[in-house]
């Protein structure tokens, strides 16, 4: 109450921010008359003038008003479009490390030209990031004439470009591209073997379109570059045949309740668990098929790989549904993005889940992959010196943007008042009743010529509605992941009189729905249209536009509430653009996922009390509030998962930054001779310490062992025992120095034989290759550690602290192994000539060619340890169990005091 009172008196933080920026808008508008008088040449010359002022020490803020005025005037001349004042406000928000929430149709693409131009003047590069290749190409080509008029270069960074094309794109003043490509290029640059192979410049300014989609929806998806691991497709096929024998149980076993099913599903957490009965049944089935030894347990260390496959198969059959979570196309399983409804070719689920789904669908099973490099979008984008974003719906996620990325959200007012009518939800008891009501609403809209956009949450639902419309003879277009090729065309005409378009979730986002249809697209379809043809198309469009406005504008019809309010708002936001008429309504049923899982008891009770009959709907603020509270719960849970994932990934990120920085230093250095010298002293010294403990008596020295080790690992054949026998005054310190000097002399001789330049090149190649190999193994070890770390909670230990401690130990181990392996390789290898270095480089390139770029959808549960699955601890080689098999009711060996089945035995 007091908060509302204070806001009324002082205005909200958003109001105060906009008020401060409004003063700069006045300054920009004051320059307009003078800039209109400038010739084209004088206007173009402004770019060089601004660059000179920046070079002389001026700040971007000091030239902002003039730069924005320049872009506005150039836009009027090139596009015949003038930036509105609200677009100037949006541009200033984007320049100040903030997120601008701008409604659909307010011209975000044109707004982005303002901060992009201003920040490009520094010469450090601007990255404008979109969600797909189509939007990246479209925005780059649309804005290219404006930027080139002002003397700036524009690059496009999309999939399929060669190294030289990529380099050219990054060297442009402004580079448009997708988040995937920028992230993958960063990883590839950090796997390069020479500075010439790198394509990116230091990360300066990123301007993200649809920022909520990229920084929030995609935040749980790490970008992964991977290489193929061993083939285990046969095992997936065999285990796939077991799952249909299992029976689902309504709820989990407890002390009071023991069911008769084999597994239970937790729909809230999106997890599946075996019951005790199910575990025994699976073990018996595996024994029958000869995949498990008689009397052996699925949970013994030797069978962890088998357990991993069983868990993956169970999840594939119970949690992942065809035409909802994925589609099968051209004998391939392709993931469908749950947030946008788009397909994601080339992206694969990790931890063997994708292979399990392939086995379930009977398509070709691709090999599992080994991670070579990975990063989350969260950690990639936090590396930019300046970061900003724009979207139509950011306010619901403002806390997360601030908490994770340090970005404030500013809601930019619309240019014209919003007149869309958002009607209350209608809730039905069954899905059939809901669909009947939807069809009736669509028919009513068509009768009055009002276009309808029907939003669905899955491909399956969109196809069901399409079948119902065919039965009712309602002409319609379907826009889902299966028909994305026609996406822009379908969306462009979705505003025509009486048209009906079914769209999966937010498919078609980024393309405006114009009332009456898109007349620009009609003109583009003609070859060299005449002025008369253009005028006729525009006149016809105006008639259609007026008809649609009179009918009530675009009607948005939601068939189900999404887990996130933001996605619902995005669907609503397709109507009412730029002050257009429009309306929206959501139709729900008690059988919808969100209602069934989160709101069912309360709302069902309410509906029963009201004595509802078949086909009758409830429309009440209480119901809407209950649904919104359910959505808030899901949003809070998803935020916690992303936050927890980031906390874990931050540990890996610190190590990644160190390794990549060291790697770049190595690559850029002319010579790493001094580094090799320092490492050599450490490595040889550490080996000597193992056989001659520091400050120890001679009786404790193991000289034969030291001689053998130096010869085996460093090709040093030294008569150490002879030295000691002949020289009484040879003590520990001087012996140490003599051994290290002997290695140095042997290495010097090698250098004289092959030449200093060849050896310097070879040192660098060995160091980089060894580091890459060890880093790859380290990533696998970190994955295994992270995915099993939640089990430490059973031993009353903090999993996060344990993860930090153990990952640091692994990293120390990596550095020590790196030093040792580099010196060992340099000691043993006989470099004959320059050709040896070239051959090594050729082999490395061959390996590179085998690497496939992969997106792996890491299940958030396994990443942060909220799942009880232990599929993560997949062994690289079979492990032999020593000691007796632990019974399920025996005390757990970890010492927690619990039964084994309730502690470390509770793996699924």
UniProtKB/Swiss-Prot annotation:
May bind 1 zinc ion per subunit. Zn(2+) binds at residues 892, 894, 903-904. It is a peripheral membrane protein. Keywords: ATP-binding, Cell inner membrane, Cell membrane, Cytoplasm, Membrane, Metal-binding, Nucleotide-binding, Protein transport, Translocase, Translocation, Transport, Zinc. Residues 898-908 have a biased composition (Basic residues). Part of the Sec protein translocase complex. Interacts with the SecYEG preprotein conducting channel. Has a central role in coupling the hydrolysis of ATP to the transfer of proteins into and across the cell membrane, serving both as a receptor for the preprotein-SecB complex and as an ATP-driven molecular motor driving the stepwise translocation of polypeptide chains across the membrane. This is Protein translocase subunit SecA. It comes from Shewanella baltica (strain OS155 / ATCC BAA-1091).
